[in-house]
């Protein structure tokens, strides 16, 4: 019996020890649960911060890429249209050459002078063409207010709103209008 009592006491002590260990384990689990929830909350906050910063980074990267493209386009435009002002000034000289050629009478005395003027005129046109300046085709074309400047309108047997006479040639450099053509348009 003594042994049974002693075994019984050992079992009770073991039970009490298990109970106290169980309580300590439950308390530890509850504190760990609280720590785990805190960590999950911190993780969620850090994830939100990361997503916000990453989104800002992507926007900045897109803005920078667009900026680089815009600068490259502007540099290209500067190169393409660098001759625009001088070409515009030369158009008046071309007009004067055309007037000189048209008004000069064709005689033996004037023939060499006319050939010289025509040669210089052609060289000037070729140089401008080499640098992207082109004449705007207008004669017998439909009137386009972006390309033509109508100074007269006249009754005509053909279709209306067509260019029937070019009073002053128009020119463009690449896709930009230097000077619209002054035209007479049919009614």
From Swiss-Prot:
The keyword Membrane does not apply. It is found in: Cytoplasm. Keywords: Chaperone, Cytoplasm, Stress response. InterPro entries: GrpE, GrpE_coiled_coil, GrpE_head. Its main location: cytoplasm. Gene3D superfamilies: 3.90.20.20, Head domain of nucleotide exchange factor GrpE (2.30.22.10). It comes from the Bacteria. Residues 1-40 are annotated as: Disordered. GO terms for cellular component: cytoplasm. Residues 1-15 have a biased composition (Basic and acidic residues). Participates actively in the response to hyperosmotic and heat shock by preventing the aggregation of stress-denatured proteins, in association with DnaK and GrpE. It is the nucleotide exchange factor for DnaK and may function as a thermosensor. Unfolded proteins bind initially to DnaJ; upon interaction with the DnaJ-bound protein, DnaK hydrolyzes its bound ATP, resulting in the formation of a stable complex. GrpE releases ADP from DnaK; ATP binding to DnaK triggers the release of the substrate protein, thus completing the reaction cycle. Homodimer. NCBIfam families: PRK14140.1. Belongs to the GrpE family. This is Protein GrpE. It comes from Alkaliphilus oremlandii (strain OhILAs) (Clostridium oremlandii (strain OhILAs)). The lineage of its organism: Bacteria, Bacillati, Bacillota, Clostridia, Peptostreptococcales. The gene is grpE.
């Amino acid at each position: 019996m003594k042994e049974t009592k002693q075994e019984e006491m050992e079992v009770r002590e073991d039970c009490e020890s298990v109970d106290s260990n169980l309580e300590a384990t439950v308390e530890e689990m509850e504190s760990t649960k609280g720590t785990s929830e805190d960590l999950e909350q911190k993780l969620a906050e850090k994830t939100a911060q990361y997503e916000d910063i990453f989104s800002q980074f992507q926007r900045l990267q897109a803005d920078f890429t667009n900026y680089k493209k815009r600068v490259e386009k502007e540099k290209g435009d500067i190169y393409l249209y660098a001759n625009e002002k001088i070409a515009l000034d030369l158009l008046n000289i071309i007009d004067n050459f055309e007037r000189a050629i048209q008004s000069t009478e064709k005689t033996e005395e004037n023939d060499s002078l006319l050939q010289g003027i025509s040669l210089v005129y052609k060289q000037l046109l070729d140089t401008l063409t080499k640098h992207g300046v082109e004449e705007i085709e207008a004669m017998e074309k439909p009137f386009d207010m972006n390309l033509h400047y109508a100074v007269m309108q006249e009754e005509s047997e053909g279709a209306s709103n067509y260019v029937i006479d070019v009073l002053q040639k128009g020119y463009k450099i690449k896709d930009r209008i230097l000077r619209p053509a002054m035209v007479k348009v049919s009614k």
